[in-house]
UniProtKB/Swiss-Prot annotation:
Protein name: Putative uncharacterized protein YLR184W
Domain of life: Eukaryota
Disordered: region residues: 90-115
Compositional bias of kind Basic residues: 90-100
Length: 115
């Protein structure tokens, strides 16, 4: 989803709020967790304000170089792409344990090998 310069404010209606938003600029990529508390996240460095309500995400990109919020940051930091993700790509934690359906659950997995 490209951010168009003519439309600085975008509203996305989503059935389930994505947990992560990836903001790409020409220089760098930043990932943002939407599960954190608060209604909005503001990146003055990128000139992006993301406000979240129940199922809506408003993305306001301040693309003017002399905007009071962006404080005249160079234009190469203008947001090029915004991606929505259900899971994090840059999070290096332990992998989530695989959930089995309730019927498959075993009391003692090693007892099966004993016969």
């Amino acid at each position: 989803m490209k951010v168009e310069k003519e439309f600085p404010l975008m509203n996305f209606s989503l059935r389930r709020l994505p947990l992560f938003i990836l903001i790409k600029t020409r220089k760098q990529t930043i990932e943002m967790n939407l599960r954190k508390k608060g209604h909005g996240i503001f990146f003055s460095r990128f000139g992006v304000f993301i406000s979240k309500k129940k199922n809506h995400i408003n993305i306001c990109t301040l693309l003017l170089t002399k905007h009071p919020y962006t404080k005249g940051f160079p234009r190469q930091n203008v947001v090029e792409t915004i991606l929505f993700r259900r899971n994090s790509k840059t999070h290096f934690g332990r992998p989530a344990t695989r959930r089995r359906p309730l019927g498959e659950r075993e009391v003692n997995p090693s007892a099966r090998s004993l016969g």
